Amino acid sequence: MAQAVDASKNLPSDPRNREVVFPAFRDPQLGNLETPVNASPLSKWFINNLPAYRPGLSPARRGLEVGMAHGYWIFGPFAKLGPLRDTDNANLAGLLAAIGLVVLLTGALSLYSNSNPPKALPSVTVPNPPVDAFNSKESWNNFASSFLIGGIGGAVVAYFLTSNLGIIQGLFG
């Protein structure tokens, strides 16, 4: 009986071992783990379709997409939860605060680009990181400048949608 239990521990196909955490790429020297979460096809699909890892995008396009998303979602908490939330100027205050935060984040990205960041390494979730992005100071600076443009654009879009919500609802019923 004990031999059967010991033998089953070494079989990845044994149903009792399906949710066991394995070393990444079955190599314990890498210092990374392959878990049911980060090795699942859904996680891999989601992460690999984010702008940072999607193949074939220039650093400027990546920065624009990431900036648009961040500017859009940063606007909401500032406008609806900020200190001016119950005033007529809440949306304008949210827009200005979101733009201010995007400018600060762009400065942080620029500082990071000047620190000579390491290249992306393959991992369980992203086995083939894009080689054309984030590999030089210039690509990081292109990403940061496009992030600024996209972030301001995303905040402005969110501002116009929120400020004109009554008109938009009237158009669509």
From Swiss-Prot:
SUPFAM superfamilies: Photosystem I reaction center subunit XI, PsaL (SSF81568). Keywords: Membrane, Photosynthesis, Photosystem I, Thylakoid, Transmembrane, Transmembrane helix. GO terms for cellular component: photosystem I reaction center; plasma membrane-derived thylakoid membrane. InterPro entries: PSI_PsaL, PSI_PsaL_sf, PSI_suXI. Disulfide bonds: none annotated. HAMAP family: PSI_PsaL. This is Photosystem I reaction center subunit XI. The lineage of its organism: Bacteria, Bacillati, Cyanobacteriota, Cyanophyceae, Nostocales. The gene is psaL.
